[in-house]
Regions:
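N-terminal binding-site loop/beta-alpha segment at the start of enzyme catalytic domains
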Residues: 1-99
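Glycine/proline-rich, positively charged
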Residues: 30, 103-198
Length: 198
């Protein structure tokens, strides 16, 4: 099996390799890694033939996207396939010191708080912010991220955010981005089957 052989993704025009680089570790999910190690990881992946990179605003509260953006910036344009996620919008904390003292999710992540937002405006804001962090004018895939009980904590919140995605226009925003050619595919990254029933 060739891990880099391309396969069509569902009914989209996008072709993906079987193997890609997941960006959670570049956001310090398991351990704090230095910038030099992040750069070396991205260089080694590229040199080994990896061209598919998956990340999220949530990974390191933007750190993973910054690192991947920096790592791909000087590579030949159009060779990398990039996937990121929507559903969380980052913003500056009102009290930076209190936030830094309480932060446990992402050690040495960027100093941003987040709010879940699957609405039309939230999806577009998340997409545009990700483009800035990734140093790109488009990404290939946008994934609806963590819209599930495991991450939101209650069925009420899951239901509310599903309503944002549906009646609040989040799905419409994704479809408009795809129709405009600004993304090639829409996905869902959840931890429970059947979470997104519509």
């Amino acid at each position: 099996m060739d891990p880099f052989a391309l396969r069509r993704l569902g009914r989209t025009s996008l072709e993906l390799p079987r193997l890609g680089l997941g960006g959670a570790s570049l956001g310090n999910i398991f351990d704090v890694i230095a910038e030099s190690q992040a750069d070396a990881t991205l260089d080694a992946a590229w040199d080994a033939g990896v061209r598919f990179y998956d990340t999220s605003p949530w990974y390191g509260r933007g750190l993973s996207e910054h690192r991947i953006g920096r790592g791909l910036f000087l590579r030949p344009p159009g060779e990398a396939i990039v996937s990121t996620k929507v559903g969380r919008v980052l913003f500056a904390p009102a009290d930076v010191a209190a936030f830094a003292a309480s932060e446990r999710s992402w050690p040495n992540g960027l100093q941003f708080q987040h709010r879940h937002d699957y609405s039309y405006a939230g999806v577009l804001r998340s997409y545009e912010d990700s483009l800035q962090r990734l140093r790109r004018n488009r990404v290939d895939v946008l994934v609806i991220h963590d819209l599930d009980l495991a991450n939101l904590g209650s069925e009420e919140l899951v239901s509310r955010h599903l309503d944002e995605l549906d009646a609040g226009g989040g799905m419409r925003a994704l479809e408009e981005l795809k129709a405009a050619g600004l993304i090639k595919a829409i996905g869902a990254g959840v931890n429970r089957m059947g979470t997104i029933p519509r």
